[in-house]
Amino acid sequence: MMDLFPDALASACLQQFRATPPLVHCLTNEVVQSFTANVLLALGAFPAMVVEPQEAAQFSTMANSLLINIGTLHRARAESMLSAITAANQAGTPWVLDPVAVGGLAYRTDFARHLLTLKPAAIRGNASEIMALSGMATMGRGVDSVDTSLAALPAARQLAQRTQTVVAVTGEVDYITDGQRDVAVTGGDKLMTRVVGTGCALSAVVAAFCALEGDRLHHVATACRIMSQVGGQVSQHVAGPGSFVPAFLDGLYQLETLTY
């Protein structure tokens, strides 16, 4: 069995994050913008969502990291994303790709595969998305995955090796790999799948942690630990999706340490 990501490393990364809270430029989908911003704020980061192409490029040189989420992709948004990524790469700003619903739709799949050539610092997706991005057959259904994260781990490793990045494939168990090293993160709750935007918000947290100096595999794994731990804890004390969201934000705000 793969080793779980250690508490001590996760807690150290969280302390580093709290000491240097990043400014995160989020080019994310229109369904989840408010929730994503609130998750980052609850953790202590600073979100911004600048979408006009010229401004997106300018702001990416000011931010500490950039999120590219293609959930509600259209051509104008794609232009903004390419402008932001180009500027981020020139400035040395790390950026994260969330390849929402790739595989089933041609335009976004082609666009996401082009983005792979632009050197993302990390990629975060569900099993079907990661398998599709790597070129493997999947059983995805829109933004949802029918494949398991463990089944997608070989694809994640291959994708990480090919793109020289960290890949997080998330599900009942999250697996994070740089193509050579793998770590696992457990926790969370099925209730999280009944709330729009938990995966997209995780990608924003991954982007925030990619702003930190040090071992990027550990930083991405810590982002997954945070969302899984708080989500799992909160789910035990709420009645359903409606009460989950405010309790989840409170849990992120109050988070001090990471323990299984």
Curated annotation (Swiss-Prot):
Its cofactor is Mg(2+). Catalyzes the phosphorylation of the hydroxyl group of 4-methyl-5-beta-hydroxyethylthiazole (THZ). Keywords: ATP-binding, Kinase, Magnesium, Metal-binding, Nucleotide-binding, Thiamine biosynthesis, Transferase. The lineage of its organism: Bacteria, Pseudomonadati, Pseudomonadota, Gammaproteobacteria, Enterobacterales. It catalyses: 5-(2-hydroxyethyl)-4-methylthiazole + ATP = 4-methyl-5-(2-phosphooxyethyl)-thiazole + ADP + H(+). GO terms for molecular function: ATP binding; hydroxyethylthiazole kinase activity; magnesium ion binding. Pathway: Cofactor biosynthesis; thiamine diphosphate biosynthesis; 4-methyl-5-(2-phosphoethyl)-thiazole from 5-(2-hydroxyethyl)-4-methylthiazole: step 1/1. It holds the Pfam family HK. Belongs to the Thz kinase family. Gene3D superfamilies: 3.40.1190.20. Substrate binds at M49, G197. InterPro entries: Hyethyz_kinase, Ribokinase-like. Its EC number is 2.7.1.50. GO terms for biological process: thiamine biosynthetic process; thiamine diphosphate biosynthetic process. This is Hydroxyethylthiazole kinase. ATP binds at R124, T170. It is an enzyme of class 2 (transferase).
